């Protein structure tokens, strides 16, 4: 399972790298079972890789024909999200224009990365997967993960992504209720 996520994100990273015109580095994927509140605690304390207190989340819900469902999340520190959008739109884009387009640009980045991952996983498992439109939310870690009971056990596949030239990092999380 870890290798499947690693392969799927490798393809998505190439697309993201082309968008921001910068090399993207990936961490080794971690796949584990954890309670939802424990994941929130780790993200808040920075144990999951030094993530800031406020994050921007790009979320899409996916379902297979046989009823399997997952939420795929792309998380970036809130302060880094504007830099990602600036890299996407180009160096000469005004700060005012970037702020106006931030939500749409983040949704598009999430759409590209998450759908590329899910498409690769669907191909790998020989399954058809349908997904929702991406939703962008910037908030505290606790609020980003409060959509289900905190004690719910979930399967988490976490892969870190970083843009070393700009000291930005984020995570792709696949959350599956078990």
Q: Which role fits each region the language model picked out?
A:
Residues 1-178:
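Composition-driven recognition of glycine/serine/threonine/acidic- and proline-rich low-complexity segments
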């Amino acid at each position: 399972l870890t290798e499947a996520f690693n392969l799927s994100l490798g393809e998505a990273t190439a697309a993201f790298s082309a968008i921001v015109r910068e090399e993207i580095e990936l961490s080794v994927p971690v796949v584990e079972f954890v309670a939802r509140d424990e994941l929130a605690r780790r993200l808040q304390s920075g144990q999951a890789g030094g993530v800031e207190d406020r994050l921007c989340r790009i979320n899409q819900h996916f379902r297979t024909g046989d009823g399997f469902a997952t939420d795929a999340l792309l998380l970036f520190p809130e302060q880094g999200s504007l830099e990602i959008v600036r890299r996407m739109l180009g160096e000469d884009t005004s700060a005012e224009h970037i702020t106006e387009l931030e939500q749409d640009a983040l949704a598009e980045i999430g759409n590209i990365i998450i759908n590329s991952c899910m498409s690769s996983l669907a191909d790998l498992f020989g399954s058809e997967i349908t997904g929702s439109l991406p939703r962008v939310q910037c908030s505290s870690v606790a609020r980003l993960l409060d959509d289900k009971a905190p004690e719910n056990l979930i399967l988490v596949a976490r892969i870190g992504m970083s843009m070393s030239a700009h000291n930005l990092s984020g995570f792709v999380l696949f959350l599956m209720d078990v």
